[in-house]
Design a protein with these regions (language model features):
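Peripheral, non-catalytic segments flanking oxidoreductase cores
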Residues: 1-359
Length: 359
């Protein structure tokens, strides 16, 4: 059972930010919808903290086995998921497809606007080139453009939104999608072991998962401190795997009421726990609020791969994890949950708060 992206709703059309940035030379050139006086710039940015680094070669060689090569690394993964919600994954075996994805991402965003708009968003559709989560005409906007594509299952791919230019874009994204799903499945297996359940209890929900790929372009801004690339939020997904294209710093996570900049490691995949995995783990693992800030002089590019359970899986705590403490989160059908996500604007962890059971 699947659900077309047209059934989910969409995002309202807005001005192209890359073009807007090229024409903005001072503060008055920036439309008011992008100025964010509510930004919590008073919150301390702590550059001394760093998210954990996980070496995938030290995790289990056999996804179905509990005989791990390095129990210490497995515990390190567990603590990262519990207390950080973010980690950088190294030695993951996907270096080649990542480099190829970086090339086509940069080439796509360098195309003339007219060419990029050939795969522009359509009314009531979340896919395509534009902006996401714009649900009202008076909503404040993010300083960035994106291309969002459904990549898995293959039956959900709408090739109308898959660029023909650059010419090697489609096969590159196909290979990238496949390899990142393999990595996500291995991580889900390790997480299940850490949660004390059989891997299949978690991985079965993601074997035919819904995977979406979002390519992000954040242009520089003459008043970078007055705009935001991506509004503070937690991901509404199960697991997000992100690569930073040009190593320009901009991703920050909120840890202990402080914003922590993520220092990009060349070739690493940044992994973060989404709201769905927090719900499925019954709160054992935590999604975390994060944002993208803008650079005064340099553009920043990234590619995020979002992994959600298949559409037959209800969104709720796994039965094996509620025996002692009871369910801490509501249970929705996947269709109900996705409709809730698409109808919501990015706003901290408000979506997850909606799912919590209050006594």
């Amino acid at each position: 059972m699947s659900m077309s992206t047209r059934e989910l709703g969409g995002s309202l059309p807005v001005e192209n930010v890359q073009q807007l940035a090229a024409a903005s030379h001072n503060f008055k050139d920036i439309p008011n919808r992008y100025i964010r006086p509510e930004l919590d710039n008073h919150v301390v940015v702590d550059e001394s903290l760093q998210i954990p680094i996980i070496d995938m070669t030290k995790l289990c060689s056999d996804e179905q086995s509990k005989g791990c090569l390095d129990h210490q690394e497995l515990e390190k993964l567990h603590q990262a998921c519990k207390h950080w919600g973010f980690f950088q994954l190294i030695n993951h075996g996907a270096a080649q497809v990542i480099e190829e994805m970086k090339v086509v991402s940069e080439e796509f965003f360098k195309l003339p606007l007219q060419e990029k708009m050939k795969c522009g968003q359509l009314p009531n559709n979340i896919e395509g080139y534009g902006q996401a989560f714009v649900v009202s005409e008076d909503q404040k906007l993010d300083w960035g453009d994106m291309l969002f594509l459904m990549s898995l299952p293959v039956s959900l791919r709408n090739m109308r939104f898959w660029p023909n230019s650059p010419p090697h874009f489609r096969p590159t994204l196909h290979n990238y999608s496949k390899e990142l799903h393999k990595i996500a499945m291995r991580l889900f297996s390790m997480m299940a072991i850490n949660l004390g359940i059989e891997p299949q209890k978690l991985t079965s929900a993601y074997e035919d998962c819904n995977q979406g790929i979002r390519m992000n372009y954040y242009p520089p801004c003459v008043h970078a401190d007055k705009v935001i690339g991506l509004t503070p939020h937690s991901d509404a997904t199960g697991l997000t795997l992100l690569i930073q294209i040009n190593q320009v710093q901009g991703l920050q996570i909120k840890k202990d009421a402080k914003w922590v900049p993520i220092q990009p490691i060349s070739g690493a995949i940044i992994v973060n726990i989404g709201d769905v995995l927090e719900i499925m783990s019954n709160g054992e693992y935590s999604s975390i609020e994060h944002r993208a800030v803008i650079n005064f002089e340099k553009e920043r590019l990234s590619v995020a791969a979002f992994h959600n359970p298949n559409m037959t899986t209800d969104i709720g705590p796994l039965p094996d994890l509620v025996k002692t403490s009871g369910e801490k989160y509501k249970r929705l059908s996947h269709q109900e949950y996705i409709k809730l996500v698409v109808a919501s604007k990015l706003d901290g962890k408000s979506l997850l708060d909606h799912m919590k059971i209050t006594h």
